[in-house]
A protein has these predicted regions:
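Two-component/phosphorelay signaling modules centered on CheY-like receiver
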Residues: 11-31
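Short amphipathic alpha-helix used as the core "switch/output" element in two-component signaling
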Residues: 41, 63-74
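A short, hydrophobic beta-strand element within the central beta-sheet of small alpha/beta folds
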Residues: 75-85
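Active-site residues of response regulator receiver
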Residues: 8, 54, 82
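Acidic catalytic/metal-coordinating carboxylates
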Residues: 35, 61-64
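The feature encodes the CheY-like receiver
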Residues: 58, 86
Length: 134
């Protein structure tokens, strides 16, 4: 089963993102968290393939959270919603283990769906290859 965790303090944003993804991919299990600590607690019982994180969280910077998650779950893909797009920020995101930066002011549902489809299709292919090699 494919899973996504959305960590963002904005409830309407989380709900909108969940709805967009579930309308196209109804079998993906999605959980939400409003803060970093809540998201980290969810990782104790819920292991997603993809995590969307807002750069601004009430209790931790999104890049710091990404780095912490990558330290214990290097296989999880992380996408950060941000308003920053400078090369320095891209470098900081890469250093934190972030695979995708998404402009918070300029994202579309289709962009998110294309990202999700790409990630989960690659995961499905990798899982098939592993099963075939056994």
């Amino acid at each position: 089963m494919f899973r996504i965790l959305i960590i963002d303090p904005n409830t309407p944003f989380r709900e909108s993102l969940r709805k967009i993804i579930n309308n196209r991919f109804p079998t993906i299990e999605i959980q939400e968290a409003a803060a970093a600590d809540e998201g980290l607690r969810k990782l104790n019982t819920f292991t997603p393939l993809l995590i969307f994180i807002d750069i601004y969280l009430p209790d931790k910077n999104g890049l710091d959270l990404a780095k912490k998650i990558k330290a214990s779950h290097p296989e999880i893909i992380i996408a950060i919603f941000t308003r920053y797009d400078s090369p320095e920020y891209q470098t900081a995101a890469n250093d934190s283990g972030v695979e995708n930066l998404i402009p918070k002011d300029d994202w579309s549902g289709e962009d998110i769906l294309a990202l999700v489809e790409s990630i989960f299709s690659d995961a499905d292919i990798n899982r098939s290859v592993k099963m075939d090699s056994k």
